[in-house]
């Protein structure tokens, strides 16, 4: 099964997450199919905290990829911010 989930990056105490499409059996930070965005939970000032390629998200959801609960929350948050 293909899932859309967060892959952690950054350094200790400075998390940064890539929003990736990956096979469910692959480890969290392992091989992925496509990177469709990022989430920076500690963005300050003018820094961008969330970016998701909506066209790619729509494509992957259309072919059956399952978003994680956190990614679902971030998508809703991004849609509310864009509206």
Curated annotation (Swiss-Prot):
Pfam families: Ribosomal_S16. The keyword Ribosomal protein applies. GO terms for cellular component: cytoplasm; small ribosomal subunit. Keywords: Ribonucleoprotein, Ribosomal protein. One of its GO terms (biological process) is translation. Transmembrane segments: none annotated. This is Small ribosomal subunit protein bS16.
């Amino acid at each position: 099964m293909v899932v859309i989930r967060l892959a952690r990056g950054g350094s200790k105490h400075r998390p940064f997450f890539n929003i990736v499409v990956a096979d469910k059996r692959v480890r969290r930070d392992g091989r992925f199919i496509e990177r469709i965005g990022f989430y920076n939970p500690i963005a300050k000032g003018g820094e961008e905290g969330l970016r998701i390629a909506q066209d790619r998200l729509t494509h992957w959801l259309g072919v059956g990829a399952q978003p994680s609960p956190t990614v679902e929350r971030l998508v809703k948050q991004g849609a509310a911010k864009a509206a």
